[in-house]
Design a protein with these regions (language model features):
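A short gly/proline-enriched turn/hairpin at secondary-structure junctions
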Residues: 51-62, 73-80
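Short, low-complexity N-terminal intrinsically disordered segments enriched in polar/charged residues
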Residues: 8, 13-45, 65, 139-153
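Hydrophobic pocket/interface hotspot
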Residues: 31, 43-44, 51, 67, ...
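A mature extracytoplasmic/lumenal domain signature
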Residues: 47, 57, 87, 94, ...
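Generic recognition of short, well-ordered alpha-helical segments
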Residues: 65-66, 113
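Positively charged n-region of N-terminal signal peptides that target proteins for export
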Residues: 1-4, 19
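Short beta-strand edge/turn micro-motifs at domain boundaries
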Residues: 111-141
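Surface-exposed, charged secondary-structure patches
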Residues: 23-25, 68-110
Length: 153
């Protein structure tokens, strides 16, 4: 009897996990699509009020409403920015109420990495923290460092 109960719990857990992974993938794809189509409501609605966005520049660290203010000129256009996900890995806490991910993106800046943390709030996943980073190939790091030195002068 205990084996049957355990097996049932195991199967149920895998189904729930698979559903959450699918929901998060869809949510993040919609979030990127919202930026590409300048859909402010969907883009910022995905983040809670205390959500954080870290961009590629060292000055780009915003709470959701600060990002909304900064990016208004971009969302006033037909497309704010267009990042296309290439791949994504999603991980879950034991309680299944926190998830984190990393993703590889195709962007106007070349390949970028995004990473983030989502929290399930009132049954819905919200993007609490997102970090965008430009991926610099290792063999170009010295050239990259030279560019940084020039920009600091």
């Amino acid at each position: 009897m205990n084996k049957i109960v355990f097996l049932g719990i195991l199967i149920f857990s895998n189904v729930v996990f698979g559903q959450d992974e699918k929901v998060i993938n869809e949510l993040m794809n919609q979030w990127h699509h919202a930026a590409a189509t300048a859909d402010e409501v969907t883009f910022f609605g995905t983040m809670p009020e205390d959500g954080i966005y870290i961009g590629t520049d060292t000055t780009e660290l915003w709470k959701r409403d600060e990002l909304k203010e900064w990016s208004k000129k971009y969302f006033d256009r037909e497309s704010a920015w267009a990042f296309t996900p290439i791949s994504r890995n999603i991980y879950f806490s034991k309680g299944q109420n926190v998830a984190w991910f990393d993703e590889l993106l195709d962007t106007w800046m070349g390949k970028c990495r995004g990473s983030g943390v989502l929290e399930k709030q009132k049954g819905k996943w919200k993007l609490k923290h997102y970090h965008l980073a430009i991926a610099v190939p290792n063999d170009l790091v010295e050239d990259y460092l030279e560019l940084l030195k020039k920009s600091e002068k």
